[in-house]
């Protein structure tokens, strides 16, 4: 069975043991040092480590960043060998996905580390959290890696409708934060229902979690699918521990969270939020967004504040929303199109997608692309969809480029679809939230399409596999 982590602390221990965590012992400034280190870690190019700051000027606790920021850390999160390939991680996630749902364990308050300390008077977020601007022109201090818990106000006791999502959070005052709830997000559905009755929406903002909680909070699953039950599935059937919110009986938070901010979204109130350096690698402008009143804070003793850097890809955010965007889309396509082999939606949260499929008949590849563009995530997010043959690895960009350069007839195989939904944080949307989409069919034509010339594939010479193994062994002995 794969390694299972109770909380962030257990995962950090394993990262350190595996050489995937760097400790910074000298005192650093919150700004610009924490964000600069997050960017620098991403720039290392391979085996990018988490960065753990032991001493932050003006703050008595520690900070960690880049926890999910490499394929090695991603593999360790799944309890795999750190050198497991991206493609193999995709198929392992796909296997575990089928174990959903695995209901969580609800523990008593006294058994939950997140309840060790309570602040319910004179709340001051500026004293409790090591706040800083992540990018220089951010409109304020941001919490960028929280897992936010809300419930459907129409069905508050329906656990399947409990939502755990990741949304950017701007700290605005001692006990107030702004939160971005875009129309395509589950939290926006719940907020709309609450505001229709002019009622506050209860909320719990959890910081520093089991890495799979953070992973699932960034994953596009169905509205009636509970993220905690997916965590249990990805833990290979081992349920996670949750505990009831102090303020709201129908909200549950991870028992091992480092910090939990409990409060409510104020109904029908919008204030300026942003600008903020977003995941596409550019600033999104200021917008009117909802505001949260924080009424209670619980935290572990000596809490670890976890945040992430967002910048020009790739940075930690790109690893955190890569395969967990790919697998749900793959599952949805596979339901009606069993010929689909794999989906690579790792680029900018699925704005760009590569699909590998066997082509059943003429025009089939385009149909697969349209199906992806009609999924709950693909409809607002995906803009460019490339479809390749089943023998092309969508995770190998060299193979994908080969397919593009040898299979695509620009006059026939490129489809442009105008007036579609678009991700408003994508800087190329105009107006924000509307887009033109593109499908590129890079598959080999099949009847009734006309057959192209000279597309018989070259088979490797006999003995190639044996020579691969022989050369590996010779290279290994040579480097001793």
Swiss-Prot record:
**In the Enzyme Commission scheme, what number(s) does this protein have?**
4.1.1.63, 4.1.1.61
Pfam annotation, one family = UbiD_C
Q: What cofactors does this protein use?
A: prenylated FMN; Mn(2+)
The effect of pH on activity is described as:
Optimum pH is between 5.6-6.2.
Binding of prenylated FMN occurs at: 163-168, 184-185
Listed InterPro entries: BsdC, PAD_UbiD-like, UbiD, UbiD-like_C, UbiD-like_N, UbiD_Rift_dom
Q: What upregulates it? A: By 4-hydroxybenzoate and 3,4-dihydroxybenzoate.
Regarding activators and inhibitors, the annotation says:
Inhibited by Zn(2+), (2,3,4)-trihydroxybenzoate and (3,4,5)-trihydroxybenzoate. Ammonium and rubidium ions decrease the activity of the carboxylation of 3,4-dihydroxybenzoate by about 20%.
Q: Name one GO cellular component term.
A: cytosol
**Database matches in NCBIfam families:** UbiD family decarboxylase, VdcC
Q: How does it assemble?
A: Homohexamer.
Q: What is this protein called?
A: Phenolic acid decarboxylase
